[in-house]
């Protein structure tokens, strides 16, 4: 949560790369915090703390509010005449996503687009897409929140496959994705084609697996 607030500060100060670094750190923390909590049996240690509620509060800050603020503050990200409506659409549909009782399915998938808005704006920023293109992307992803596709939960792969080897390969791919994202941020404003290709390939693989497991369980 603290890093999310610092991200907002850096966005306000127009230090966009610094803000993206901080947002990347929040994604890494989110990827491992649940695993670490289960590893130490945090429910037993802190029985009166609702970890799931805290996780949702922090995730809404980091995955929704911070990216929305980025889109509003950085010039050229959205068409000025539609920016308020687009941000309203993103924030309201995301609130719906977070409030669903089955937003995370019993077999550990996300139902509907899982509000990866921080990752979305990273690619908008790196590819320098036009405001009109960004608007279309935001509208499509907001609609996908209501489409019951089961998106892979990267840190919980037990129901994705029974193969231990495939699970290990998925974790390796996730690590490669993280490293490639780091290289992309380090290289900016230059473009590291290899790292960018690896990053986009991972997103493609993630979407393929999600749609495949939805329609061919």
Curated annotation (Swiss-Prot):
- GO cellular component entries: plasma membrane
- Kindly list the GO molecular function terms attached to this UniProt entry: phosphatidylcholine synthase activity
Q: Which reaction does it catalyse?
A: a CDP-1,2-diacyl-sn-glycerol + choline = a 1,2-diacyl-sn-glycero-3-phosphocholine + CMP + H(+)
Q: Which regions face the Periplasmic side of the membrane?
A: 9-16, 72-77, 129, 186-191
Cytoplasmic topological segments: 38-50, 99-107, 150-164, 213-217
**Keyword terms, alphabetized:** Cell inner membrane, Cell membrane, Lipid biosynthesis, Lipid metabolism, Manganese, Membrane, Phospholipid biosynthesis, Phospholipid metabolism, Transferase, Transmembrane, Transmembrane helix
Names of required cofactors: Mn(2+)
Q: Name one Pfam family in it.
A: CDP-OH_P_transf
Q: Where are the transmembrane segments?
A: 1-8, 17-37, 51-71, 78-98, 108-128, 130-149, 165-185, 192-212
Q: What class of enzyme is it?
A: transferase
Quote the InterPro entries the UniProt record gives: CDP-OH_P_trans, CDP-OH_PTrfase_TM_dom, PcS
State where the protein is found. Answer: Cell inner membrane
From the record, give the cysteines joined by S-S bonds.
none
Query: Which EC number(s) are documented for this chain?
Result: 2.7.8.24
Say if the entry is tagged with keyword Ubl conjugation. no
Which membrane topology describes this protein? Multi-pass membrane protein
Can you supply a Gene Ontology BP term from the record? phospholipid biosynthetic process
Instruction: Briefly state the protein's biological role.
Output: Condenses choline with CDP-diglyceride to produce phosphatidylcholine and CMP.
Family of the protein in this entry = Belongs to the CDP-alcohol phosphatidyltransferase class-I family.
What is the protein name for this chain? Phosphatidylcholine synthase
